[in-house]
Design a protein with these regions (language model features):
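Catalytic cores of the polymerase beta-like nucleotidyltransferase superfamily
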Residues: 1-226
Length: 226
């Protein structure tokens, strides 16, 4: 990222602490530049295995091994017009399979937010979650989410609930034990009211209309304050 900033000067801003990114501005357009990563150093992981700093730069081969899902580990070379696939990601896409690279338990420990990403991708793409993930994705392992900062957890939750498939993902949030980590004081139950609002939210997103996430949270709390 520092080298990118040296090239673009004031038009570049480095963001992120856990993983630095370079934001390059060209007029009104924003281009996000991510540098290839190498395996993290032991010293920057928490007691539960969560990666606290991931700014160890490396090669494309090292970077591919650091990706979370196979479908996120493909690289496009625009000048040559080719896609580099090191992990049979194309097969996973054709078979509509969501697969983590490496040991799923270790990948969740490295970054518990990957649990939310698992549900988001599965619901949005209508992919089947790989059996190796299902074996370890228990309500107990969701306790790892308690180590995630509230700000990051909120951001990832927003992506989960505003992707246009809220009706599909809500039952998954309950079944996989995520609900109790996000809404500790709300009963894990999809009422007809919540289902109606979720359906309406999805429809508005699909129609290109704006939504207010606060409205959905208000519906979740409706029974609490009646």
């Amino acid at each position: 990222p520092a080298q990118i900033k040296d090239v673009f000067g004031r038009r570049c801003r480095i963001i992120g602490r856990r993983f630095e990114l370079a934001h390059v501005y060209s007029g009104r357009e924003l281009i996000e530049v991510a540098t290839f990563r190498a395996p993290p150093k032991k010293a920057v992981t928490s007691a539960t295995g969560m990666i606290l700093r991931d700014n160890n730069w490396g090669s494309i081969e090292q970077d591919f091994a650091r990706r979370d899902f196979s479908i996120n580990a493909m690289y496009y070379q625009p000048r040559k017009g080719i896609v580099l696939d090191f992990c049979n990601a194309v097969d996973d896409i054709q078979n509509r399979r969501l697969r983590l690279l490496g040991d799923p338990l270790l990948r969740f420990e490295e970054d518990p937010v990957r649990m939310l990403r698992t549900l988001r991708f599965a619901a949005k793409l209508n992919f089947q979650i790989d059996d190796d993930i299902l074996k370890i994705f228990t309500p107990e392992i969701t306790n790892l989410l308690r180590d995630v900062s509230p700000h990051r957890l909120y951001d990832e939750s927003q992506k989960l609930f505003t992707m246009g498939h809220l009706n599909r993902v809500l039952p998954m949030v309950i079944d996989f034990g995520i609900w109790k980590q996000l809404f500790t004081d709300i009963q894990p139950k999809i009422t007809p009211f919540i289902e109606l609002v979720a359906k309406n939210t999805d429809q508005r997103i699909q129609m290109g209309k704006t939504i207010n996430p606060a409205f959905f949270y208000a519906v979740l709390l409706w029974q609490q304050f009646l």
